Amino acid sequence: LGLPVLCTSFAEAKAALGYSDDFANYDLCEVMYTHFQLFGCQPVILCNMLNPATMKATVTAADINLTDHKALLPIDAINDASLVVKPSTSGSALTKGTDYEAYYSGENLVVEAIEGGSAYSAAKLNIAYNKVDTSKVTKTVVAGGFAAVDSCMSTVGIVPDLLLAPKYSSESEVAAVMATKAGGINGMFGAKALVDLDTATANSYTAAVSTKADKG
């Protein structure tokens, strides 16, 4: 968390940080896809500021139907001690590794009943869990992440020449930190800050210029 991660391929980036097509909530995944899949560029240095240990929300227990002995939870479900699986609302919690396994596959956290376990013949399971709350990644958190720029040389051996913070850089506070950091990395290198403009207001060339001026 908050450390530079050097990636030279789409597969490497996914293995290092995980991946989802939900770009509205997972901005680094959008960078991965755009950088490697759309434009075929490499490398890229990614810095994750989403901490699922603290940036989470509770999902109330609910019955979920099983298909092929599997219950599919959304990708933002967290596979940790908060995952409680029961045969019913009033039943006792099942044992992970004996009655079920939980693992990520595609865009889901899969809860699969184990053959020989007490839930293998169940048609549904009652499941409670915590989920990632991406709304807790605030502009302040993202701005703070740019402190990692100065450690890129010592940790990954490369100094970035372009700084990005998709969506967040449209906030003046984040853009200001990016501009300052781009002006002097490790006291000797320079970079360019690629800052987003909110197209809700910057919807023409003229508006883009005025919005840029307003944001500083």
Describe each region flagged by the PLM:
Residues 1-216:
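Surface-exposed assembly/interface segments
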